[in-house]
Amino acid sequence: GKHKNPAEYTASSESELQYMRHYLKYFESMFSEVYVCPGNHDRWVMNYFEMSFKEIIDTMLGEHNLIISPYEYITINDNLVVGHLEEWNETPGLLAWKIAKQFRRHALVGHDHIRGMYTENNSKLYGVSLGACLVPANIYYKRASFNSFPAFQNGYAVLENKNSLRLMSWDGKKTAVEKTLILGSTQ
């Protein structure tokens, strides 16, 4: 059969920016501190416009109170590293757990666009795949290419204090707590 033109059912760059604005403004209105790290798609935009990630966010949002990292990861407190990986895996949290072992901190990661947690027996470390903040049907390479990617899932994390982490799912309208983790000592 004839294939549809991906432009007919994937979002334009402008509509993707509108989604991003919506998500960031939503989080900013809900939480006192919101950390944002760039990912692989942001690097394309940064290179194209020859702008830093912070300059892109500032231009896109105008005035905001987001905490923008120039790096693809950040360390929070002494027990948590959060960031965007270069690779992905179909097992939620597996790559995050490998990062957790490497950094000796619990790890929360993006890039695989799925939610879930991984740990091993007797380990004090958690590896968590956060999910994504996107409209899955609008992602060109997911819809228009022949691939084995698992279904994308939206999610994020809320660090309530130094040791309490809520893993959240979000369908664009409703937020739900998927799991609450107590982040104990990692040593």
What are these regions (language model features)?
Residues 1-66:
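Core catalytic region of metal-dependent phosphoesterases/phosphodiesterases
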Residues 79-170, 175, 180:
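Conserved beta-sheet core of the metallophosphoesterase superfamily
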Residues 181-187:
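Glycine- and charge-rich intrinsically disordered segments
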Residues 36-41, 72, 167-172:
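Acidic carboxylate-rich catalytic motifs and surrounding loops in phosphoryl-/glycosyl-chemistry enzymes
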Residues 64-79:
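Short acidic low-complexity segments
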Residues 29-31, 62-63, 77, 102, ...:
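Short, well-ordered coil/turn elements that cap or connect secondary structure elements
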